[in-house]
């Protein structure tokens, strides 16, 4: 498998595109992350194969839970919920962050740029299997320094599990996380 995630990823949207061909046939999340939410929704219960990528003491190997754990390292306290709009070719992403007033989930548009921008990268790395290739452009975009360092750690752990990762970055924090 091969995934390329461009620097100009989708920002927060009111809904995201579905593509059964890209998501099921090609196992792609889109060069701009446009199918990341659909991929996560349709593969949420699959187990992560790369043991090196598994998050800390988290007992669940489910894809969605592992993605949430890693997103939580980059943007603390995040949980996700996908809302399928039935026969539409669109799907919604709802986000909850610990510390928000109330226990509500909010649309991606109402929680800032970082989560939407980083989700395709985290998903690509967590779902990757040994022998796959991932090319990432500017994974540090819209992340604070700690989030950039954690992104570097995630990249390094994917590579330790046999995933070939090519990264174009201008961030010392990403490089420090990889070390």
Feature roles, as predicted:
Residues 109-112, 148, 153:
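Active-site Asp-x-Gly
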Residues 57, 105-108, 141-142, 164-168:
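Short, charged/polar micro-motifs that form catalytic or ligand-binding hotspots
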Residues 150-179:
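C-terminal lobe/lid and adjacent interdomain/linker elements of RecA-like ASCE P-loop ATPase modules
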Residues 132-133:
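The start of beta-strands in P-loop NTPase/AAA+ ATPase cores
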Residues 1-118, 124, 129:
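Phosphate-coordinating catalytic segments in nucleotide- and nucleic-acid-processing enzymes
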Residues 136-139:
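Walker B catalytic motif
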């Amino acid at each position: 498998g091969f995934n390329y995630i461009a620097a100009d990823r989708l920002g927060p949207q009111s809904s995201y595109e579905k593509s059964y061909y890209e998501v099921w046939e090609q196992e792609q999340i889109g060069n701009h992350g446009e199918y990341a939410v659909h991929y996560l929704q349709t593969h949420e219960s699959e187990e992560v194969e790369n043991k090196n990528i598994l998050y800390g003491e988290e007992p669940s190997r489910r894809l969605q839970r592992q993605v949430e754990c890693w997103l939580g390292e980059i943007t603390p306290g995040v949980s996700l919920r996908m809302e399928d709009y039935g026969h539409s070719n669109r799907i919604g992403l709802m986000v909850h962050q610990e510390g928000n007033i109330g226990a509500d989930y909010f649309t991606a548009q109402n929680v800032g740029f970082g989560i939407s921008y980083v989700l395709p990268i985290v998903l690509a790395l967590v779902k990757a299997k040994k022998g796959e290739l991932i090319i990432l452009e500017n994974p540090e975009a819209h992340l604070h320094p700690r989030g950039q360092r954690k992104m570097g750690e995630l990249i390094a752990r994917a590579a330790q599990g046999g995933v070939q990762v090519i990264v174009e970055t201008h961030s010392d924090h990403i490089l420090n996380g990889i070390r």
